């Protein structure tokens, strides 16, 4: 099947059809054919013009193949968060854990394909902020609100990777230095790796990150299966046991927290428009997306289930590296995670930096050429982002719980609500207010599906935020909240 037909079912064979020829009074299928051909032509023309404008630039942005884009996606999704899936399964039970992992993966794939279709229709879109503006009445206010959420989301992910970098260094060195120093070191190293100006330039690092992470989780899974006992094994507790379904005393907050943990690992659609905007052939993005999603579902499910079965409810930690009984096993498997500890923060820093940089230097020679002003500004923006990320990570004593709140609020929009609305927006533009009738059975099914997607987003925004806030309250009550700018050990076995 032609890729444009995947994006726009019923693609017309006449490439010269334009929007003016699309008569709403035509039969639905013929009308859709006229429209899809028009959008396909518009995409080709716009991308061609963008590539042509870069012909004499020394820095070319539309250079990513679908393979390089797949590497970026693999590095974004195949990450440390995988090692928290065993904990989620221990809370939810094996059967619900597997079902929810597969279900969330499929829903995120569907919404990501909606993003792809939207970007093909409107190839001038550069990032999620442009989409937000277009979806909600072309409002500049919505653009600014989306930009604030976009930058906060990305910066908080950078902050998280400052902390997990410090966690790794503390674990390996037995807390040989102040945690603040370790997290600052992580920020400094990440700044250096953030310097490439294009996603194509980052793709090799992304490939290394994804491969190393896969090795890390594979080793951890094998080690959990072959060692005699997990860490803190106690003969009085007995051997590890696992449950097919949640324990009877599992609370709503605990169960929802485990579900959110699974969902947050899948939700990464915020970067997709930025990736598509730098592809040579945006119509090939579905290949990258499908390959990564299949790998995600398989890896997340197997790692979560296998480690949970061998570690059990009694000895589970998050991340699951801490459950390995042999310290050497733990250090070896955790060490292969280093590239992703660095690169995932780098990727989000790069997405934020180009968002700012492009808007400052759009239409100038500094954007596409090696100029002192261009490079000084690029480095300055990145440095500012990493310094801010480090300060946030160290200044907020309940940062991890705050990240859950941010994830629930922002994930509701960037993971679900935006893309349900995007489907309705495109269908309304093509077929009018009764689009679901004109599209037949498919129209009704997709309408129900996308309304469900929006409702899931609202669930994240409401109960999801409540569960995250309640987690912060419980941490305070249990004395689990530390202090700001602390040197305290945050290693896995501190």
Predicted regions: what is each one?
Residues 1-394, 404, 414-494:
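Intrinsically disordered, low-complexity regions flanking or connecting the multi-pass transmembrane cores
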Residues 400:
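Residue-level detector of conserved, function-critical positions
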Residues 405-409:
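Non-cytosolic membrane-interface motifs at loop->transmembrane helix junctions
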Residues 397, 410:
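Short Gly/Pro-enriched loop/turn and capping motifs at secondary-structure junctions
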């Amino acid at each position: 099947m032609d890729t444009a037909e995947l994006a726009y079912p019923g693609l017309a064979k006449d490439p010269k059809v334009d929007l003016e020829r699309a008569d709403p009074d035509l039969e639905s299928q013929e009308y859709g054919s006229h429209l899809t051909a028009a959008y396909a032509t518009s995409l080709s023309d716009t991308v061609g013009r963008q590539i042509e404008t870069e012909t004499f630039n020394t820095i070319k942005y539309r250079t990513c193949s679908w393979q390089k884009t797949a590497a970026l996606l693999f590095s974004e999704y195949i990450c440390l968060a995988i090692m928290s899936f065993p904990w989620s399964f221990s809370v939810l039970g094996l059967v619900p854990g597997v079902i929810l992992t597969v279900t969330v993966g499929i829903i995120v794939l569907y919404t990501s394909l909606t993003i792809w279709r939207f970007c093909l229709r409107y190839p001038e879109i550069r990032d999620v902020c442009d989409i937000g503006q277009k979806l909600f009445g072309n409002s500049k206010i919505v653009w600014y609100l989306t930009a604030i959420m976009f930058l906060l989301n990305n910066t908080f992910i950078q902050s998280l990777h400052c902390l997990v970098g410090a966690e790794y260094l503390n674990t390996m060195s037995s807390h040989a230095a102040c945690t603040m120093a370790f997290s600052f070191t992580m920020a400094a190293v990440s700044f250096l790796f953030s310097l490439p100006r294009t996603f194509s330039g980052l793709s090799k690092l992304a490939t290394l990150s994804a491969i190393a992470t896969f090795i890390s989780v594979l080793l951890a899974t094998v080690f959990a299966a072959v060692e005699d006992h997990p860490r803190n094994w106690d003969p009085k507790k007995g051997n590890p046991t696992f449950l097919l379904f949640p324990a009877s005393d599992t609370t709503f907050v605990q169960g929802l927290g485990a579900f959110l943990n699974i969902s947050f690992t899948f939700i990464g659609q915020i970067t997709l428009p930025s990736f598509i905007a730098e592809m040579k052939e945006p119509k090939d993005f579905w290949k990258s997306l499908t390959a990564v999603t299949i790998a995600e579902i398989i890896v997340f499910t197997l790692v979560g289930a296998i480690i949970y079965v061998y570690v059990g409810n009694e000895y589970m930690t998050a991340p699951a590296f801490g459950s390995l009984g042999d310290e050497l096993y733990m250090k070896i498997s955790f060490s292969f995670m280093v590239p992703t500890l660095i690169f995932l923060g780098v990727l989000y820093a790069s997405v934020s930096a180009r968002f700012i940089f492009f808007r400052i230097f759009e239409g100038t020679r500094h954007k596409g050429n090696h100029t002192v002003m261009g490079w000084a500004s690029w480095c300055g923006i990145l440095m500012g982002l990493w310094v801010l990320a480090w300060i946030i990570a160290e200044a907020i004593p309940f940062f991890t719980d705050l990240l859950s709140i941010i994830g629930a609020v922002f994930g509701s929009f960037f993971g679900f609500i935006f893309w349900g609305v995007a489907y309705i927006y495109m269908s309304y533009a093509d077929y009018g207010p009764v689009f679901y009738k004109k599209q037949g059975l498919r129209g009704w099914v997709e309408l129900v599906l996308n309304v469900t997607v929006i409702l899931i987003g609202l669930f994240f925004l409401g109960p999801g935020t409540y569960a995250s806030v309640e987690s912060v309250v419980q941490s305070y009550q249990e004395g689990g909240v530390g202090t700001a700018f602390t040197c305290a050990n945050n290693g896995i076995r501190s």
